[in-house]
């Protein structure tokens, strides 16, 4: 199966530039029969991803698009509504063209590692972390209610008590090599379930 993974720096593997073969997408490609194409773009928002789907990916007629986005939407605007609208648009437009979409539920963030934003004192790290949590829950419910396949990258990065597994991150947002390994394992299981 040819899988196009659309995303931002988390998909691209921004913190693994020295060895991009350790990105989650590359690990999945190496460990399965699937052809996995990394379409991550550092700094991209779901609006940019939506446009890239229309101009670059839909014409390729992939067997599956994995859409993992929203991190930059929240970091730039402090809310997730536009990301929700863009994901709905991608899924509906892809379905019209007969292209299956799997939605990735994004990672949590390490709130204490976020840099303070003096121009927005009412938007502290805990507020932003709450937006990520709310977005993840919205995606989970929306995908379930609409019968859209989803891969939950969020919960595996949390401990049982709900705290973030910081050892899997290189900074506030990006997974390190161990985090990429975990993402690959999660996606491999999700693809197995999808193929059943």
Where are the regions a protein language model picked out?
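Serine-esterase "nucleophile elbow" of acetyl-processing enzymes
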Residues: 1-48, 52-61
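Alpha-helical cap/lid subdomain in secreted, periplasmic
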Residues: 26, 30-31, 35, 51-196
């Amino acid at each position: 199966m040819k899988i196009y993974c659309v995303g931002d720096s988390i998909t691209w593997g921004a913190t693994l530039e020295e060895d991009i073969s350790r990105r989650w997408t590359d690990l999945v490609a190496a460990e399965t029969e699937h052809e996995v194409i990394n379409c991550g773009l550092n700094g991209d928002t779901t609006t940019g991803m939506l446009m890239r789907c229309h101009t670059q990916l839909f014409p390729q007629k992939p067997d599956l698009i994995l859409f993992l986005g929203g991190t930059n939407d929240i970091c730039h605007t402090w809310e997730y509504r536009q990301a929700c609208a863009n994901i709905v648009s991608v899924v509906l437009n892809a379905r019209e063209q007969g292209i299956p979409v799997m939605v990735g539920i994004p990672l949590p963030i390490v709130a204490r590692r976020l840099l303070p934003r003096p121009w927005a004192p009412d938007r502290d790290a805990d507020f932003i972390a709450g937006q990520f949590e709310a977005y993840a829950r919205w995606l989970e419910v929306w995908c379930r209610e609409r019968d859209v396949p989803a891969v939950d990258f969020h919960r595996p990065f949390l401990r049982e008590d709900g705290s973030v597994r910081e050892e899997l991150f290189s900074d506030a947002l990006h997974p390190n090599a161990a985090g990429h390994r975990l993402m690959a394992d999660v996606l491999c299981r999700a693809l197995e379930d999808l193929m059943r």
